[in-house]
Design a protein with these regions (language model features):
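Conserved short histidine dyad/triad with adjacent acidic residue
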Residues: 78-95, 105-119
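Short, Lys/Arg-enriched N-terminal segments with co-localized hydrophobic residues
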Residues: 6-29
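A short hydrophobic beta-strand segment most commonly corresponding to one strand
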Residues: 101, 150-152, 166-178
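Short, conserved beta-strand element in jelly-roll/cupin
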Residues: 97-109, 115-117, 125-131, 174
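A short beta-loop-beta micro-motif enriched in histidine and acidic residues
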Residues: 72, 88-100, 118-122, 138-139
Length: 178
């Protein structure tokens, strides 16, 4: 399943009312797909090929929790093992410097999503140093992301990860915005 606008290569920033500063991503929305289809998205960012190569590692499930460098600060992964949270606990987060490629190794992550253009309840200004902004708005969609599938969240995609009734094991690859 792909949820991406096909005209992103000819982005028209004048049409979009979103606040992100990277116009090429202003007309995208989150992507959900199986890892076997990942190469179809490599043209969206030159770091995606390295991100997907990392996610295809035979030893991915055995990697230790924490940061794993792939291409320095440009592409790196965080391996996460965490108990899932309830939907009421999560808050929308958005990033501007990095795109999240969230891959589920085990468990089912019921990630929430809402377009940034409809977020009206920022908790604070964007934190440039840590690359995040939190919103109190509630998601407009929930997406069940199962093992072997990934979700890509662009700067326009506030999202709530780690929503599950079970233990989750994930790889979150951070890909620098171009």
């Amino acid at each position: 399943m792909c949820l991406v606008r096909r005209d992103i290569f000819n982005a028209r920033p004048e049409v979009d009312k979103c606040s992100t500063r990277h116009s090429v991503y202003k007309e995208t929305i989150m992507i959900l797909d199986a890892l076997e289809n990942a190469d179809a998205y490599n043209a969206l960012n030159s770091g995606f090929a390295k991100a997907f190569e990392f996610l295809r590692r035979d030893d991915l499930a055995e990697l230790e929790e924490g940061r794993h460098d792939i291409d320095g600060e440009r592409v790196y992964a965080m391996i996460v093992k965490a108990a899932g949270r309830e939907t009421e606990v999560g808050e929308l987060e958005a990033h501007e410097q990095y795109i999240d490629v969230q891959y589920v190794i085990s468990g089912t992550d019921e990630m929430g999503w809402r377009p940034r253009s409809s977020c009206t309840q920022p908790q604070a200004e964007y934190n440039d140093e840590d690359d995040y902004q939190m919103f109190s708005d509630r998601p407009t969609a929930w997406v069940a992301t199962e093992p072997g599938t990934f979700a890509i969240f662009f700067p326009n995609d506030p999202h709530i990860p780690l929503i599950s009734a079970e233990q989750l094991h994930k790889a979150v690859v951070k890909v620098a915005v171009e």
